[in-house]
Amino acid sequence: MEELDVEPSTTLVPAAGVLQKHLGFEWGPGDLLVYETNYKLRGSSSAGSPLVHVVRKDEDICSPILRKLFNESHLIFMGLQKIKEDAPSKNKKTQFVSISRNYRSVIRACMEELQQNAVTAQDGSLASQYGDQVSILLAIELIWNLCEVLFIEAAPAGSLLLHLLNWVRLHKSDVDTRAREVLQSENPTQHPAYWDVVTSLVLQGRMDEARQILSKQASLRMESSSVFKRMDTLLQTMPIFNPAGAQTLTEFDVKWRHWHEECDRCLQDHTFASSAELETLCKILLGDEDVILEQKDLMSTWYHFLVSRLLFTHPTIKPPDLHYYAQSSMNMFLGPRATPEPLDIILLSAFEFDLHQVIKDCSIALNNWWFVAHLTDLLDHCKLLQSHNLHFGSNLREFLVLEYASGLFTHHSLWQLAVDYLDHCPEFGRVYLELQIERVPLDTERKANKVLRICEDRQMSEQVRSICKIMAKRALRNNRLGSALSWSIRAKDAALATLISERFLQDYSNKGSFTDLDVLDNLGPAMLLSDRLTFLGKYREFHRLYGENRFSDAAKLLLSLMMAKIAPRSLWMTLLTDALPLLEQEEVIFTVDQTYELMSCLEELNSGTKDSNQMEQEEDLESTKTELLRVALARNLATAIVKEGTIET
């Protein structure tokens, strides 16, 4: 897309910069943080305001009703991505039109709900907000519908005008309301809006409905019934092209010209001179542009004027000729002094078949990326944007989808939808996902597990480790050691696993028992992640064997922990003390060699450097434990020698 050639809108930040302070800012994923600095434009620096202002462009993402739009359009988007490239073109076109209509039905449903809320809202500002959102969705649906007609359906001459008539009827539906009011009144022909309704129906090409209302007048005015019958005949015989019929465009054109000549003859013969309203209708049927333009209050928009003008002057308009009529209709309707609104410029670009200008102007005018992202994606699938690449490597479709998905990532629940959008951005989607997924707030373990599944399914190993480390540290801060250990193992972080294992052992030293046994008993091969974790797992296994009265296995495991030197030195005395109950069993558990090894460990422990900060009471306790162990080891050694000597004999 080209560089922005219009001035961006100004956003006022309340109370910021009042004291002529410089403003600092920081970009976030979906918003901008603005704050006052200590520096003034003039004079010495001083303390600024402590407030940080959050400036957000896309406010719609916070609306509960519009979230339904985002959720439902996500399903349509995913269905569109499944359409196979090799499907027949005719089948694909039908599918694309159906998908486009699905998008529009979602917009309409959302718009209706917003309108209901605007009516029932007690708060005036909230009602105004709903009204603004309805206006935006109306414009979006209007543009989308026109793009559907011109680009997706690509209606040819003849059919094109029929589609444009349906487009105008859909977006100028107040005629139906006024028609009901007229018909339901006591005297429809005397209703102030009677002729306005008839004229409006004719301008929309709804001739049968116009005839129905005109018949009310004809039945009351017997003296001029022939005049009304003549108008009824003109309305009834007006040719309408039927794309499904056998009639060619040339045949239709000949038939239409004959009908047009008949209208002109009626006007020249002053057939309707007795009724100014019928004469005006005849001039409209004849395509008198000045008379049609006089009804601008009934049409209210230049594009309604365009379609009505084409209906009565050029019903077989070809797509390439549309832009001329569109430009001249807008100029005639708005006048030389009026400035077109952004919506007018966008619609004019569509009539000029300038797709990229439509997308560019919509990106500037609308307050979120939803519309341009989904419309561009659909148009790209229709192969209408293949020639347009951006200077920075991505194509237009991917750029807009990336922007939309990035906005979704700022919402507490919609971020999950964003993942699917990024999955379908082949060039930069993976990079964006890796950056954005780490910014998702991990409020709960359930949410963290959702994020992890997304990362694991996509082999994003770095993000998996990062998330697991965050959760492990959070659990550790909250003293949830079992959860912390599980997360550190999933992160494959040896240093963190060692730290948590230390906390487990410290907790055991203080309480005399282990917590989170379900985690410790099911470590499996994961205990090999670090030496300290291995020790923790094996030490817990020792306690389990001891509890199951498997004393011999427990003794071997305890001794292997001592000899392998993987136990922290601070726990040696604890391990040796754990051997005391085994040494005092009636049955000899430790062999002579094993007893010597335990003695060696005890002496090595006592020969080490003493902690100068160790209190006297602690020294006495250590000495008592040492004496008890020496006695128990000596007694066990004697018993083991006797037993082994007896066996040898």
From Swiss-Prot:
Subcellular location: Nucleus, Nuclear pore complex; Nucleus membrane
A GO CC term attached to the entry: nuclear pore outer ring
Gene Ontology terms: biological process: mRNA export from nucleus; nephron development; positive regulation of DNA-templated transcription; protein import into nucleus
Keywords: Membrane, mRNA transport, Nuclear pore complex, Nucleus, Protein transport, Translocation, Transport
Broad class of where this protein is predominantly found: nucleus
Gene Ontology MF annotations: structural constituent of nuclear pore
Family as reported in the entry's similarity comment: Belongs to the nucleoporin Nup85 family.
Subunit structure: Component of the nuclear pore complex (NPC).
Known role: Component of the nuclear pore complex (NPC) that seems to be required for NPC assembly and maintenance. Involved in nephrogenesis.
Name assigned to this protein: Nuclear pore complex protein Nup85
